[in-house]
Amino acid sequence: MLFEPALKPARLIQRYKRFLADVVTPDGEALTLHCPNTGAMTGCATPGDTVWYSASDNRKRRYPHSWELTETASGQWIGVNTLHANTLVGEALRAGTIPELAGYAHLRGEVRYGAENSRIDWLLSAEGRADCYIEVKSVTLLQHQSGYFPDAVTLRGQKHLRELQAMAEMGYRAVLFFAVLHSGIDRVSPARHIDPHYADLVLQAQQYGVEVLCYGCQLSRHGMRIHTPLPIIIS
């Protein structure tokens, strides 16, 4: 995906109330951005880092600017807008650049399914093949030279794992897909030190047939794309 129109830079002052961030542009203008990320954003919102933001022409929006990327002082790039993870995976599925998920004729997004009334991020189907349910998670937490998910306790994520396991038990393909939106991450693990129940559910779901995939992304102020598979360490 390309950022069009081009993103603009600013210096981060603070993130607060989860969905807001104060920044200062290179010409000294103070702005309040919408922060499209509900997580803890540990390591992604250090005051002084460079924020790259987009602008909306929707006059009804109270905060027309959105925080898209962080460029850290050490030169790492982080995708802050978690909505982009689904978009990136969808683009890669359509292009056939994820070999493990290639060969399906039909792709649908946000399809309702499961006993807990969830929505699957992507559903693949083809004649003669079992439907494939794909749940996408955005990974940005870097600690101890490894990436972790989640960065906070996630009841919603736990529900998604239960739903995926149920689909696998019914004979469908079920895939948990970690999209790594942090240039400094080269491997990923469930964050047992943050949400031990989520980590247990990942291990259990895998034992029942849920596939776990992890791909890194190329990130820049110009755009992003799914790039290369990364190791996933589950214990």
From Swiss-Prot:
Listed CDD domains: SfsA-like_bacterial (cd22359)
Pfam families: SfsA, SfsA_N
InterPro entries the UniProt entry points to: SfsA (IPR005224), SfsA_C (IPR040452), SfsA_N (IPR041465)
GO molecular function: DNA binding
The organism's place on the tree of life at top rank: Bacteria
HAMAP family (alphabetical): SfsA
Family: Belongs to the SfsA family.
Protein name according to UniProt: Sugar fermentation stimulation protein homolog
Taxonomic source organism: Sodalis glossinidius (strain morsitans)
